[in-house]
Amino acid sequence: MFTGVQNYTQEVIKAAKYIGQGFTITLDHMNRLPVTIQYPYEKLIPSERFRGRIHFEFDKCIACEVCVRVCPINLPVVDWEFQKSIKKKQLKSYSIDFGVCIFCGNCVEYCPTNCLSMTEEYELSVYDRHELNYDHIALGRLPISSIKDPMVYGVNGLSYLEKNIIQDNTNKDTVTGPYNKE
C-alpha cells in the first residue's frame, strides 16, 4: 500500500512539474511588451524564414513539374511543349493562384534548379480573387524590400532581431505621406 501511495505522489509531482513548465512560458509571454504597429504607415519586417509570395525565374525552369507533384493541392500550372529539335521540354507558361496557395514552401524546397523562391511580400489583398492568379510574368517581378521601402518606419525592439539591424527610415526628405504634409 505504501508503494502505491508513493507512486501516486510521484505522478502528481511529475504532472505539477509539466503544468508549471507550461505556466512559466505563459507568464513569460505576459511580461512582454505589446508589439502593435500602425499597419499602413509602419510595416512589420518579416523574420528570416518568412514564407511570403513566391518569386519565379522563367529562364531557370526546366519544366520538370516537381513543384506540382510536391504541392499538397497540385497548385502550380506548368504549360510546356516538347521541342524535337533540341529534345527538351520548352516552358510556355507557369502560374500560381495565391487565393488557393497555402504557402507551405514545398515547391521552393524541392525545385531542382532553384527557379522558385519565397519573398518577404505579404500584402496580397485584392478586391477580386481572380487577380490572385499570377502568371510567370507577375511571378517574375521582385517586390520592393520592406527594409528599402521609404514608406516603412523601422520597428525597433523585436525579439528576433539583433541590435542595430533595423535603421530608422524616418528621414524627412524621403518619407512622404498624409502625415508629412508641409
Curated annotation (Swiss-Prot):
Gene3D superfamilies (alphabetical): 3.30.70.3270
Compartments it resides in: Plastid, Chloroplast thylakoid membrane
Binding site for [4Fe-4S] cluster 1: C61, C64, C67, C111
TM region positions: none
Described purpose of this protein according to its UniProt entry: NDH shuttles electrons from NAD(P)H:plastoquinone, via FMN and iron-sulfur (Fe-S) centers, to quinones in the photosynthetic chain and possibly in a chloroplast respiratory chain. The immediate electron acceptor for the enzyme in this species is believed to be plastoquinone. Couples the redox reaction to proton translocation, and thus conserves the redox energy in a proton gradient.
Gene name linked to the record: ndhI
GO cellular component: chloroplast thylakoid membrane
Keyword Thylakoid: yes
Domain 4Fe-4S ferredoxin-type, chain residue ranges per copy: 52-81, 92-121
E.C. number: 7.1.1.-
Name of the protein in its database record: NAD(P)H-quinone oxidoreductase subunit I, chloroplastic
